[in-house]
Amino acid sequence: MAKARSGAAGLGLKLFLLLPLLGEAPLGLYFSRDAYWERLYVDQPAGTPLLYVHALRDAPGEVPSFRLGQYLYGVYRTRLHENDWIHIDSGTGLLYLNQSLDHSSWEQLSIRNGGFPLLTVFLQVFLGSTAQREGECHWPGCARVYFSFINDTFPNCSSFKARDLCTPETGVSFRIRENRPPGTFYQFRMLPVQFLCPNISVKYKLLEGDGLPFRCDPDCLEVSTRWALDRELQEKYVLEAECAVAGPGANKEKVAVSFPVTVYDEDDSPPTFSGGVGTASAVVEFKRKEGTVVATLQVFDADVVPASGELVRRYTSTLLSGDSWAQQTFRVEHTPNETLVQSNNNSVRATMHNYKLVLNRSLSISESRVLQLVVLVNDSDFQGPGSGVLFLHFNVSVLPVTLNLPMAYSFPVNRRARRYAQIGKVCVENCQEFSGVSIQYKLQPSSTNCSALGVVTSTEDTSGTLYVNDTEALRRPECTELQYTVVATDRQTRRQTQASLVVTVEGTYIAEEVGCPKSCAVNKRRPECEECGGLGSPTGRCEWRQGDGKGITRNFSTCSPSTRTCPDGHCDALESRDINICPQDCLRGPIVGGHERGERQGIKAGYGICNCFPDEKKCFCEPEDSQGPLCDELCRTVITAAVLFSFIISVLLSTFCIHRYHKHAHKPPIASAEMTFCRPAQGFPISYSSSGTRRPSLDSMENQVSVDSFKIPEDPKWEFPRKNLVLGKTLGEGEFGKVVKATAFRLKGRAGYTTVAVKMLKENASQSELRDLLSEFNLLKQVNHPHVIKLYGACSQDGPLLLIVEYAKYGSLRGFLRDSRKIGPAYVSSGGSRNSSSLDHPDERVLTMGDLISFAWQISRGMQYLAEMKLVHRDLAARNILVAEGRKMKISDFGLSRDVYEEDSYVKKSKGRIPVKWMAIESLFDHIYTTQSDVWSFGVLLWEIVTLGGNPYPGIPPERLFNLLKTGHRMERPDNCSEEMYRLMLQCWKQEPDKRPVFADISKDLEKMMVKSRDYLDLAASTPSDSLLYDDGLSEEETPLVDCNSAPLPRSLPSTWIENKLYGMSDPNWPGESPVPLTRADGTSTGFPRYANDSVYANWMVSPSAAKLMDTFDS
């Protein structure tokens, strides 16, 4: 009896322990949907059926039991109201309205929703006594039912459309587990419509249902499965149904309804060997680095990839080995990949598991072993028949590595090679395949005197790169062959091997061009790239890589030390030693313009031309300036014909003019349009015809007459009434001319008075000076540019000739810059606020570097305009640039009255004078003046601007300057001058004119500098303390203006005629020819016009008849 009692007690305890399990049995049931949708209306009657929720069985015999959550929630899971409006039949899953809702119910929910109109609420439906708590709803044991509240009464039944009666507003989809008993998962009927509109008939028919595992009951319209589904056969179904709607007195309508069914997977397929292969063999030899994959085996599983959280628990892989060395050296990595397989013409998801045998540590080159490794794979959740365990076999052989070098290496090297130039590579056998092996290379020179190379080890391919380490040794004549011993050492085992190396030195050393940058990447244009060298250049010259011009591309245009190695998208061990070698691959700074950055550094792809400034740690990728040919062959033919026709017309017109000239009386000639600053030192002025031959001007054929008797033709377009002009104080004067400040009444139709400047001759001026003034008058009538001094008019009748030009408030640029130094070093940063005085008087604020660049840019724009007009200035300098209000630059000095704002600069002595320190080298030696010689002068002008009006070549007399320029000497970079600005100066001072930039390119470069300029110029720091730079007591105002002898200069004189003639200097070592390869007048023409008259506007003297004709054209 006691035993019976104790047995009964034990049974009771077991039953007590099983009670929770029995209570949880309905949890095997699951909802066929995770969300349901329905509408609720105001005054909808109580008892209205809303919808059915369905549960499917996980095992036979399970009976569903439904319950609702306690509260209604807002869409943001806000608890709004206790649920007493909607009830559910726990057995059938039917939800119905427990009470009618009115407008107050709507308002009550809206108030609890924070005053916002409420549109949607949801409640939770649970299966049985699920352990999920209120507010925690997760499929498959819980589903949400969303209700859209409509603040209106139920619509009239006749207003419904057929689709609204057939299917819910939101689509429906279903989830059914495989291998589960069949059951009902949906009911077609729209219950509220059926309840409130009984006269409307809605019937459904499942299409093509015979071949599918689904059926629809024609009476209750319930959709259920016919048999258990198998996901491995078909994973997705799309059911099609036909809905027929019929109402009283209405035609029958049919609507197609579709809804998807997804079959959920369970682990019912065992793992198998992919392709039936369960063994892999591997050899470990050159790849010995930790993480190296030794071998891979694949395992196929027809089930889907488990969730990441389940993967580690479900699939386990264990390395079975009693060898501790193997356990430490190898590990197994498991990676599942989803794949698709075909089953009954359907694509079904499956899983391919990759098991990789990986080195857990790096192996030395001396390690040698042979072993077999077994890996156990276990699918722990497998529920089907058979086994979920597999054994993978790996046969591994670890072989030792022997270091060997070739018998000997031989490379050439150019004597002009720059430092870090790559000469070649050394590499032990199979080094390209090495991984995890660390090799160090060293060079042992046979002679220390001729040791010019170094070696650096590449971390990528374990090779050694030979490079130039000492350029001085390469230049020694005795160093014709460099001999070394290459030693390769394994860092871990210290094993070594060696080979001989012979390097032959070739070529002849040529000195570097003056002003070349340290890095080839700085150069943006091909000519300056190929004439300079840079770090890493094997030939001593940079190489230009021309891009394909196809948008942002890896093949962008750039300047490189060697296109074989740079840029290649990879910053190697040698390039990383100095950023100047190949910043295109190694720069980590910002890249401006269209580009694609490399993974860690450099430019992967760029747009147009990419150039870099390593010192500033910036690169720029910008469109190429040069475009494709604008004119094809037909176009060129038409232009040639037009030019030929124009030439014939010109010849006929010239013949007619000459004939009229000899037929009629002489009239005063029209002055030259050349911007001359000093007549050629000859007995009479020389003019050049379009053919380039000399002919005497009218000065040599006419007697000298007084200025007063010189009759000037009136030009009605430009004539200004003399009585309306009131002259004021003198602004500046020379020996024969002066400029005064004046006011003009009703100038150009303006009301009131306008402040102007008036140019005029002094009483002692001759006809030659008058011709100069007339020359400037005729020239200014033809130019119109915001940065060229503007002509307003002239008083040419009934008195001396007066030219009325634009008034420049601040005088010459040189004086303006020097006065700015008196403001003092105080300045405000870009982030600070300016004081009130600088805001009221913006022209008086302290200069910034951006202002100085803006001055240079304005002048370059004006010179670009003059160059396009085929005009040569010949005296471009800061003293001849005027500063108008608003700090606007005005190019001036086109004739006699040049530099009258700088009183003592051009005071004419007994002889003419020329500005030596501003003149191009070909102008000094060959008396040749072109637009490119103006570019040279512009470079000196840049130097004046940056130094705030400093004197060029301070302390250097002109007689020394000639030899210095011939030997390549150029002014050094001022302290406050940026590298980019100084490079532009050096480009302007190129010895060959055709290698200097044109003004259009100069303007573009200055525009970019203006964009990048941000800092204010510190006048205290930027003003040099050297008194030579600004001391006028050294007569620098006179020194640069060299006297021109009045005697004729025969073209047979040597190129140093200025030195010999002016200073009586001679030197037997001076060359007899000019250092500039320019052709003289008796040879072939140069690439640029020698004077302005070689182009459109000429220094030509015309006959009176032709002058009259030109006056007619002008007016």
Curated annotation (Swiss-Prot):
Q: Which residues form the Protein kinase domain?
A: 725-1017
**Which keywords accompany this UniProt record?**
ATP-binding, Calcium, Cell adhesion, Cell membrane, Disulfide bond, Endosome, Glycoprotein, Kinase, Membrane, Metal-binding, Nucleotide-binding, Phosphoprotein, Receptor, Signal, Transferase, Transmembrane, Transmembrane helix, Tyrosine-protein kinase
- Region of interest (Cadherin-like region 1 (CLD1)), ranges: 29-153
The record's Gene Ontology cellular component field reads:
axon; dendrite; early endosome; endosome membrane; neuronal cell body; plasma membrane; plasma membrane protein complex; receptor complex
| Catalytic-site annotation from UniProt | 875 (proton acceptor)
Gene Ontology MF term list: ATP binding; calcium ion binding; transmembrane receptor protein tyrosine kinase activity
Residues that hold ATP according to the record: 731-739, 759
Residues the record marks as carrying a glycan: 98, 151, 156, 199, 378, 395, 449, 469, 555, 689
**Region Cadherin-like region 3 (CLD3): start-end pairs:** 266-380
Membrane side Cytoplasmic: residue ranges: 659-1115
Binding of Ca(2+) 3: at which residues? 267, 269, 301, 303, 379
> Which proteins does it associate with, and in what oligomeric form?
Phosphorylated form interacts with the PBT domain of DOK2, DOK4 and DOK5. The phosphorylated form interacts with PLCG1 and GRB7. Interacts (not phosphorylated) with PTK2/FAK1 (via FERM domain). Extracellular cell-membrane anchored RET cadherin fragments form complex in neurons with reduced trophic status, preferentially at the contact sites between somas. Interacts with AIP in the pituitary gland; this interaction prevents the formation of the AIP-survivin complex. Interacts (inactive) with CBLC and CD2AP; dissociates upon activation by GDNF which increases CBLC:CD2AP interaction.
Q: What PANTHER family does this protein map onto?
A: PROTO-ONCOGENE TYROSINE-PROTEIN KINASE RECEPTOR RET, TYROSINE-PROTEIN KINASE RECEPTOR
Protein name (database record): Proto-oncogene tyrosine-protein kinase receptor Ret
Q: Name its species.
A: Rattus norvegicus (Rat)
